[in-house]
Amino acid sequence: MKLPKEGDFITIQSYKHDGSLHRTWRDTMVLKTTENALIGVNDHTLVTESDGRRWVTREPAIVYFHKKYWFNIIAMIRDNGVSYYCNLASPYMMDTEALKYIDYDLDVKVFADGEKRLLDVDEYEIHKKEMQYSADMDFILKENVKILVDWINHEKGPFSKAYITIWYKRYLELKNR
């Protein structure tokens, strides 16, 4: 499949382990694609939940997906600084319909002041039993929490101020064409 190009708009679909559609984002603007990663931006993007509820994102957010890591990263650009919402999730795949991944419940939130929180541990434990996550899957996800926290602590990739500056600036250039 041909990779989307800078400035293209794509749909993002999040699924659960049992194959059910969890959430859809319409019209994410692509900023960069490589063989293994995609960087995009959501800005007033329509989001549809599995129960049909719809809402629109409030602020620009740079999104980062990778084919080798079991997480994706959303950097929300707010007046008080950048905060992050990180989903523990399968590496993404693309088809002609959308960028797709499986959401594995665990999330790491990083507030603009640097505080970190691991979220939805109870939901993860419930779904682990209900959807029968394997021991290998559990290990992979927990190891990727460690990798993610290391990235946060060392300001790697999307957690670097320079990264946010570069990609937000590029988004503004593309948006104003």
Swiss-Prot record:
Mg(2+) 2 binds at residues 105, 107, 120, 123. InterPro entries: DUF402, FomD-like_sf, Ntdp-like, SA1684. Its EC number is 3.6.1.15, 3.6.1.6. Belongs to the Ntdp family. It is an enzyme of class 3 (hydrolase). Disulfide bonds: none annotated. Its cofactor is Mg(2+). It catalyses: a ribonucleoside 5'-triphosphate + H2O = a ribonucleoside 5'-diphosphate + phosphate + H(+); a ribonucleoside 5'-diphosphate + H2O = a ribonucleoside 5'-phosphate + phosphate + H(+). The active site is at residue 23. GO terms for molecular function: magnesium ion binding; nucleoside diphosphate phosphatase activity; ribonucleoside triphosphate phosphatase activity. Has nucleoside phosphatase activity towards nucleoside triphosphates and nucleoside diphosphates. This is Nucleoside triphosphate/diphosphate phosphatase. NCBIfam families: PRK13662.1. Mg(2+) 1 binds at residues 87, 103, 107. Keywords: Hydrolase, Magnesium, Metal-binding.
